[in-house]
Amino acid sequence: MKIAIDAMGGDHGARIIVLGAVEAVKEYDVNVILTGDEKILKSELSQYEYSKDKIEIIHCSEQIKNEDKPVAAIRRKKDSSMVVALNLVKEKKADAIVSAGNTGALLAGGLLILGRIKGIDRPALAPVYPTSKGVSVLIDGGANADCKPRNFLEFGIMGNIYANKVLGIEEPQVCTVNIGIEEGKGNDITKEAYKVCQRGPFQFKGNVEARDIPLGYADVILCDGFTGNIILKLTEGLATTIFSELKKAFLKNNITKIGALLLKPSLKIFKARFDYSEYGGAPFLGVNGVLIKAHGSSDAKAIKNAIRQGISFVNNDVVGDIVSEIESLEADFIE
């Protein structure tokens, strides 16, 4: 198996991406193709010991930066590390792509280069969301600010397959985010989405309120990308605030410091539950290929886990299952 990695993407440059790739080839049965500036990549790789036949470099003369306009960058920067990596997947020279680069450009590239799965109107980001019961899949995490009711059905199908095949959740419970659990709650879109999802090929549980999401009420959480991104960002900010306030409380005096020392192992486990690097990245579901979007500020651990995620998607043929499920839908679900 080969994973293409956009080695020039991310906030920390090639150093972190290369280290994550090296750790991945040591731990997993995978080969990696690094796309980017050959001189920089060779310099970074020279610092580590690894099986030389496990990592390949493809030189790219261009780089898509965070300030670049997504669609224009994909169309104009043909020799950028991101575009080259996407084309490797399209041409079947790589089984998946991992990138921590410009999110808008990566999603645009996924659509323009890999293309949509037939029957999927809106591909979507599907990050995992930590809960008191484990993790849930939240879809859409930010790719589509506005959605139609039928998009919720597509999200449910894709999220259900992801939760089952990759996360190992038996018969995932699927819910739509709403301001109340009753069927008649919400706006016109969410009301109609509820009706459509009731007929979907998955275990539809109904609506879920935001307060119940962290409690693990649903295994797959359906919402438009605007709502999903707000949920994610609010949770990230809240987690950061909680840990910051705990730190202040534990450092207040010598007694609290002793308490902190005793609780350190448990606090470490608790903090890891909210650490995005533990989960890797968010898959862009609905395109013809495995595309994993890693966080822009990913460390080496996050990159390694994003590669692991890509491996799992390929091994479980998630894309193939989505294609089959969409093809088997009745025409009135899609039209």
From Swiss-Prot:
Keywords: Cytoplasm, Lipid biosynthesis, Lipid metabolism, Phospholipid biosynthesis, Phospholipid metabolism, Transferase
GO BP annotations listed: fatty acid biosynthetic process; phospholipid biosynthetic process
EC number: 2.3.1.274
A GO CC annotation given for this chain: cytoplasm
GO molecular function: phosphate:acyl-[acyl carrier protein] acyltransferase activity
Major site of localization recorded for this protein: cytoplasm
Family annotation (InterPro entries): FA_synthesis, Phospholipid_synth_PlsX-like
Pathway(s) served: Lipid metabolism; phospholipid metabolism
Superkingdom of the organism of origin: Bacteria
Quaternary structure note: Homodimer. Probably interacts with PlsY.
Functional summary from the UniProt entry: Catalyzes the reversible formation of acyl-phosphate (acyl-PO(4)) from acyl-[acyl-carrier-protein] (acyl-ACP). This enzyme utilizes acyl-ACP as fatty acyl donor, but not acyl-CoA.
Protein name: Phosphate acyltransferase
